[in-house]
A protein has these predicted regions:
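Helix-rich terminal scaffold detector
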Residues: 3-11, 175-303, 307-313, 419
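Structural signal for hydrophobic packing residues in well-ordered secondary-structure cores
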Residues: 19-26, 43, 109, 155-158, ...
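Short, hydrophobic/aliphatic alpha-helical segments
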Residues: 36-49, 90-102, 292-293, 297
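Generic structural signal for well-ordered, non-membrane alpha-helical segments
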Residues: 7, 11-15, 28, 32, ...
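Short, low-complexity N-terminal leaders and the immediately following helix N-cap/first helix
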Residues: 1-75, 328-355, 416-419
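Short, glycine/charged-enriched hinge/interface segments at domain edges or termini
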Residues: 2-5, 11, 17, 61-232, ...
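Flexible glycine/proline-rich
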Residues: 28-33, 42, 88, 148, ...
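Solvent-exposed alpha-helices and their adjacent loops that cap or buttress functional pockets
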Residues: 54-56, 71-74, 92-96, 109-111, ...
Length: 419
């Protein structure tokens, strides 16, 4: 077997090569309740103002501000209540001299009124109340169009539909939404040493953990996943299953078979399917032998058989590819700063990614490596919610150093409730 030449490239360049490929998914229409985590296929433009009318943000009384002038603790001014309305109701009364309408949160401001007095700012007595301070025009009023005006772009094409976007779409009556179809993913674990989850352990064998992990990572993105039978180290069967997966899926992910061992056949498989290898070595640890190929608008990811390296490869390279195929506005991993709370003394000839646990505090984010951090480690992944990114050419970092982290989970818990 001829060992393929590998020239390492930086992580950023590897991601850029992925997103430079011409690969896009078609637009489809889905029900609003099925649109979460999809990418919008078009701008959403406001068809009316929000709020649609001047409304009260509080429970209280709608008054004419001019009638409140001169009010003080020594000169309380009295108002007569002429009507009572709740949200969804409109008063048919015109508020006149020293008159008021009892109004609930969200209700439309009645004609004649231009300020709202909160209940707690009054002393009530039957159908009257008094106030002890003056109010200005439009005080305590949410004005028509103050949030959004007709014609404003309220959601952009390429934006991820999150729960907030769902609320906006519902507000403007989108029972169906035009989105980009999400790619389907094939997951193929390779290696004669692999056993299925329910198999009894044998000497020299390990259970397939990467396949279920990748499936979970893909399903977390809302992707349709096809799981293929674990492949033994055989070139012909490997070519056959990859070809089959390419016919049915937009992305094919294999784990294992990407190194330079006697039974690592992935380079030969890529040649057989006429895929262009975008890169086959990345200047990083773990996952340096991560390989990505491309053919006919489809991505083929060769991730390491080592669990931590496999996880890192998915986060750094598969996620951006999925976002790119769906036309997302942001495709690169988002990086934030955090304070390292433990020494990490290992030298880093290449960019190193460490599984870690981030915590949000009043002073900012802190991060602690999550246990054993070799490429074959699996338990550390379960206790991590981020990856620390240490630059190449460094000789370790002391506690207190500011580092870059990539959040991989949304459970970066607060150390304390920040009020």
């Amino acid at each position: 077997m001829v060992v393929e030449k590998r020239n390492p490239i930086p992580v950023k360049e590897a991601i850029q090569r992925i997103v430079n490929q011409q690969s896009s998914m078609p637009a489809i229409t889905v029900a609003l309740e099925k649109s979460l985590n999809h990418i919008l296929a078009e701008d959403i433009v406001a068809t009316y103002d929000i709020p649609r009318f001047d409304k009260s943000p509080y429970d209280g009384f709608a008054i004419r501000s001019v009638d409140s002038q001169g009010a003080s603790g020594q000169n309380r001014i009295e108002f007569k209540v002429i009507n009572h309305i709740g949200a969804g109701s409109v008063s048919d009364k015109l508020v006149g001299d020293h008159e008021a309408v009892r109004i609930m949160t969200g209700a439309q401001i009645p004609n004649g009124a231009d300020a709202v007095v909160m209940f707690e700012q009054t002393i009530e007595l039957e159908d009257t109340f008094t106030i002890r301070k003056p109010f200005s025009k439009n005080e305590n009023i949410s004005l028509k169009g103050e949030e959004t005006k007709t014609g404003d772009v309220v959601l952009k094409k390429g934006q991820v539909i999150n729960p907030g976007a769902i609320a906006v779409l519902a507000t403007y009556g989108y029972a169906e939404v035009k989105v980009i179809k999400q790619p389907s993913v094939a997951v193929i674990a390779t290696g004669s040493e692999l056993l299925d989850v329910n198999d009894v352990l044998e000497d020299g064998k390990i259970r397939n953990s990467n396949g279920p992990m990748i499936r979970a990572l893909a399903e977390k993105l809302g992707l349709e996943v096809g799981i293929y039978k674990t492949q033994k180290d055989d070139l012909d069967s490997g070519i056959q299953v990859v070809k089959e997966a390419m016919e049915k899926h937009d992305i094919v992910i294999t784990t294992g078979g990407v190194s330079v061992g006697d039974f690592d056949y992935l380079p030969e498989i890529y040649k057989a399917v006429k895929a262009e290898v975008l890169f086959n070595k990345v200047a990083m640890r773990p996952g340096s032998v991560t390989t990505v190929a491309f053919v006919d608008g489809k991505y083929l990811f060769g991730l390491s058989g080592n669990p931590s390296a496999c996880f890192t490869g998915f986060e750094l390279f598969v996620k951006p590819a999925v976002k790119h195929m769906c036309g997302a506005l942001e495709v690169f991993p988002q990086i934030i700063k955090a304070t390292l709370m433990e020494d990490f003394t290992k030298a880093n000839p290449f960019t190193r990614f460490i599984r870690a646990k981030a915590t949000l505090t009043s002073a900012g984010a802190t991060v602690v490596p999550s246990g054993f951090n070799k490429s074959g480690a699996v338990v550390a992944i379960a206790h991590a919610n981020c990856m620390v990114m240490l630059p190449g050419g460094s000789r370790g970092f002391k506690a207190g150093h500011t580092v870059d982290i990539i959040l991989t989970e949304s459970d970066a818990a607060e150390e304390e409730l920040l009020l």
